[in-house]
Amino acid sequence: MTDAALELCGGTLPENIYYGIKKIITELAFHNLEIIEGVEQTLLALQGHYTLIVATKGDLTEQMGKFRSSGLAKYFHHCEVMENKDEKNYLELIAKHDIRPEELLMIGNSVKSDIAPVINIGGMAIHTPHDIVWVHEKMDMPESDRIIVVKRITDIVDFLL
């Protein structure tokens, strides 16, 4: 956010804009996370049966802070914060963890960031639609028999165990 403001302001931020941005970032960083109903129950069921990795995008400090404060870190082997969730970064992630594309199963609510790139590299995906999706994340679902759509996150357990 600060980088974008610097670019828009020609490399120098007026003091009032700097403090306004700092206030927004602080509010975002300390905003209480709302864990979707059934997430912890699902993770508890899957833990021990699968290597669970969080793949998220955004600012490293902010995302790791959210991950740690969520109370869900105990269920995961690793948390990967990517600049973009695209084919290149998913391939780097699975190479780092010695996972073949066909062994990768991504569970997520964004077709653009979670589902399509994983399908494009040969993985599988479970789409968990959410009422709120950023406009820049909207895209049509790819045609693939490697995609499952569930209504509730707890439905995942029925497919995987």
Residue ranges and their predicted role:
Residues Y18-Y19, E27-E34, V150-L161:
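Charge-rich, low-complexity terminal tails
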Residues L44, L60, M64-L161:
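Asp-based, Mg2+/Mn2+-dependent phosphohydrolase catalytic module
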Residues K57:
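Acidic ATP/Mg2+-coordinating residue in the GHKL
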Residues M1-E27:
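A metal-dependent, Asp-based hydrolase signature
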Residues N16, K23-V54, E87:
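Short, acidic loop-to-helix structural element flanking the phosphoryl-transfer center
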Residues E7-L8, H49, K96:
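Alpha-helical structural context
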